[in-house]
Structures are given as structure tokens and as C-alpha cells.
């Protein structure tokens, strides 16, 4: 499953290209954040996040969604961010938000 947020469409395009290549489903964060869903990845299923970098960090809606979401553990989590030239503190901020959920093991690159 690939969760995405897109402001002008770039991240949406990336999410759909990834989903096509990985035979995965795409879930828009702007819609999913309104739901009270529990996400249960199947064994070995990847969980991805795609979003733009806003001010050298993930957009507020992405961090709010991570805090709100209920998810069972996943073996593999990744994120892809779109940006002009610099991701700033995005990796650190996103990783900290995910680690607080306690359901993902993060491995820095």
C-alpha cells in the first residue's frame, strides 16, 4: 500500500508510477485522514509514503496522518519525497514520527 499526499500533482504522479511498477494500491492521505481505518499489511507487504517536501520537512497533513493512523506492523516501510533541491530535515522528522508509532523498524540509509 502506498499512502500519498500531493499539493500540485507531482507526488501523486510518483505514487501512481510506483504503484504500477510494484503492483500496489494507492491511498490518498487527504481522504484517508478522515477515516477511522485500521491498516493491516499482509506478510511481506511494503508500506510506502510519497509526499512533497515543504520547508525542509514533511507536510503537516502527512505527520498528522501518521500520528492518527492505526496500523499493524509491517516488515518494510519506505518513503519517497519530491522536492526542488534539498530535503532538509525530512528524513529525520519522518523517521521520528514513524518510530513513535512503534510498529515499524527503521533502518537509516
Predicted regions and their residues:
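FMN-binding flavodoxin-like domain, especially the glycine-rich phosphate-binding loop
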Residues: 2, 7-109
Amino acid at each position: 500500500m502506498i499512502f500519498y499526499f500531493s499539493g500540485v500533482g507531482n507526488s501523486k504522479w510518483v505514487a501512481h508510477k510506483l504503484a504500477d511498477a510494484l503492483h500496489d494500491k494507492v491511498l490518498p492521505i487527504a481522504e484517508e485522514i478522515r477515516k477511522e481505518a485500521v491498516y493491516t499489511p499482509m506478510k511481506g507487504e511494503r508500506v510506502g509514503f510519497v509526499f512533497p517536501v515543504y520547508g525542509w520537512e514533511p507536510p503537516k497533513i502527512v505527520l498528522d496522518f501518521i500520528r492518527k493512523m492505526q496500523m499493524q506492523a509491517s516488515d518494510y516501510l519506505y518513503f519517497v519525497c519530491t522536492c526542488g533541491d534539498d530535503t532538509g530535515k525530512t528524513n529525520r522528522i519522518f523517521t521520528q514520527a514513524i518510530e513513535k508509532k512503534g510498529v515499524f523498524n527503521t533502518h537509516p540509509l
